[in-house]
């Protein structure tokens, strides 16, 4: 039986055809040679391209082996033992681990759970920052696993009130969100870092490549992230091919948006289910506690692997990655089948 993994927020459509062509046409130099981008006064062809797209100095674009790598570099660059990092209360578990690795202190700021969506509690966030004076703040937008984004207005409020804190905006899922922060904010706020990955939207998680746009005050991380001998040239070429394939990815985004609406409608009809609105490539669903184990087993027996949350306050929730349209239809119909058979007992 084929297993369908919808628990890791990957893009099951796969990368654009142009990405495969890079591998088909790769030549020896990409394997054997170091980069020569430094001859043009830049770090790489990819950082040069991204800088041009955002009208930034190439020195303010850094590359990393996934967003995880850039977040880790930020913490290791700036956070000393005993210093404080603010993170969302409900978010990626690795945020906590990064500070722990350097002896830092994690401070959790709250999210508010509404009827069918979550949102950041900006007032509580700022009050905590005023009291604790954190060195770093991680903001995830859209946030994993709750799917909510921070509005431009709220983000600017945070940036204005926390001028002495480095604000890392993790936009791993930004292509699926209606808000666009980077282009007009990173030039305005010198303490802002906007982090983006090729893993999610571009379906290149295995390639391990991401980038960040950094505010003008953050020269230390720019120096730390620099690699004199360059980055993975094949990965860079694949990433450039993805950037040159907007129509392919826009078509996938439209399919995912349509499927999200079907999830809201179909799962929202099931008694005891709450489907939360999401700006990302996944949705969060609250289910009755008493069916958690039996539903998980029912889905797993049919080859459907979803993320059943075990975190405090989210331990009756499922995070469902948006797969292909066929996969999404199968998940919905299987959950409806379980619900129907369960209600007949």
Regions found by a protein language model. Name each.
Residues 1-68, 73:
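N-terminal small-domain helix-loop-helix segment of the aminotransferase-like
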Residues 77-135, 139:
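PLP-dependent aminotransferase-like
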Residues 153, 297, 301-302, 306-307, ...:
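PLP-dependent enzyme catalytic core of the Aspartate aminotransferase-like
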Residues 57-61, 82-84, 171, 190-191, ...:
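Short acidic capping loops at alpha-helix termini that bridge into adjacent secondary structure
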Residues 257, 267-302, 318, 322:
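Conserved PLP-binding catalytic core of the aspartate aminotransferase-like
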Residues 114-173:
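Active-site phosphate-binding strand-loop segment of PLP-dependent enzymes
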Residues 14-16, 102, 191-269, 274-276:
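PLP-dependent aminotransferase class I/II
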């Amino acid at each position: 039986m084929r297993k369908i993994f919808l628990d890791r927020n990957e893009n099951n459509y796969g990368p654009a055809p142009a990405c495969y062509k890079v591998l088909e046409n790769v030549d020896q130099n990409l394997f054997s040679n170091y980069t020569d981008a430094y001859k043009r006064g830049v770090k790489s062809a990819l950082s040069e391209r991204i800088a041009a797209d955002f009208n930034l100095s190439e020195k303010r674009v850094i590359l990393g082996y996934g967003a995880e790598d850039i977040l880790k570099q930020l913490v290791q660059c700036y956070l000393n033992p005993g210093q404080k990092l603010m993170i969302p209360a409900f978010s990626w578990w690795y945020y906590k681990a990064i500070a722990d690795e350097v002896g830092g202190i994690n401070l959790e700021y709250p999210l508010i759970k509404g009827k069918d969506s979550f949102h950041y509690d900006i007032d509580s966030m700022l009050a905590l920052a005023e009291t604790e004076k954190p060195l770093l703040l991680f903001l995830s937008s859209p946030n994993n696993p709750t799917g909510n984004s921070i509005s431009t207005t709220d983000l600017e409020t945070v940036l204005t009130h926390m001028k002495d804190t480095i604000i890392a905006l993790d936009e791993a899922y930004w292509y699926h969100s209606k808000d666009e922060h980077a282009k007009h904010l990173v030039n305005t706020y010198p303490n802002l870092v906007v982090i983006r990955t090729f893993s999610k939207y571009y379906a290149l998680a295995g390639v391990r490549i991401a980038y960040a746009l950094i505010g003008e005050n953050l020269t230390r991380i720019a120096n730390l992230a620099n690699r004199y001998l360059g980055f993975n040239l094949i990965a860079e070429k694949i990433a450039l091919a993805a950037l040159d394939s907007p129509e392919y990815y826009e078509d996938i985004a439209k399919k995912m948006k349509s499927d999200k609406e079907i999830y809201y409608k179909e799962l929202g009809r099931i008694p005891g289910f709450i489907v939360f609105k999401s700006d990302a490539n996944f949705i969060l669903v609250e289910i009755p506690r008493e069916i958690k184990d039996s539903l998980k087993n029912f889905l797993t027996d049919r080859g459907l692997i979803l993320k059943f949350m075990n975190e405090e306050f989210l331990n009756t929730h499922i995070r469902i990655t948006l797969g292909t349209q066929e996969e999404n239809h199968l998940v919905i119909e299987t959950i409806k089948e379980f619900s129907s058979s369960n209600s007949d007992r």
